Every structure is written in structure tokens, then in C-alpha cells.
Amino acid sequence: MMSTSVPDAVLGVLDSSLDTGDEAITITTVDEDGWPRTALLSIAEAVLTGKGRIAILLHDASTGAINLRRDGRLLVTVAAGGNVYDLRFSVQENGPILADPPRATFTGALCAVREQRAPYATVTSGIRFTLHGPQSVLPRWHNQLTHLRSSVEKF
């Protein structure tokens, strides 16, 4: 089923506490040959508003950043509320490169949402991970989220 509204369950995942910080989302971009390229982002690398505006951080020289600069089509996949959601966005690079490591900010607007569900099964989790050094990662994540929230508000 397609819609243009951000599901509350998706907003709940992206608003998860950084204290657990174990949720990942998948992004898909299109490379120069037309093939899909996937990457994982932590919840500290994406901010989504209820109005369908998104801001993400990618390593500046990553394939995803290169693809978005060229094409601007972004698919974000999130497991939430017992389902999987594909959110399509049109994005562009926005603002200066963040340093250490160099990261690019992309902002954009929601184009469509596709909900994937099966009557015979419930999705119980998406991709999860464990931080090896949360004490060194979490302060950076807090700074990233502050930057992304500011970027998405300006968009």
C-alpha cells in the first residue's frame, strides 16, 4: 500500500533513545549504472519529521553521497510496528561538510511511503548492532543529531 504520510511507528524508531542506540535503518541509492546501492545508517545519522522532511549524514566520499549528489533519489527502509516501510525521498546536499570524519548533509522531502506487511507474520525487528565503545560514540551522535535537527528545520 502506498501513501504520502509518515507512519507514527517509523517516527518512533527514528526518535529512539541514543542510550540503546542499537537500531539501524537501510538506505538505498542508485549508482551511475542504474543499480541499487545499500548502506546502513544509525538512528544518529537520520532525522525525519512528521511532515515528511528528512536530513541524513553520509561520509563525504561514500558511494551513497556520490549517488545522491548525482541523482537525488533516496529510499529509506525501516522495520517498525510489525511491518517494513520503504520511504521514497527526493534529496539534495545542504550545507557545509562536517569535519572529523568529513560528512555531507542531505535534506529532502517525502515522495511516497510503501508499507510491506504479511497477514501470516509480524516483523519483530530490523537490523540491530552493538556499539564497541559507546562512551566515545554517543557524544558524537548527540552532536550529529543537533546538526541534523537544525538542517531539517531550515529545509
Predicted regions and their residues:
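Binding-site signature for planar aromatic cofactors or substrates
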Residues: 1-155
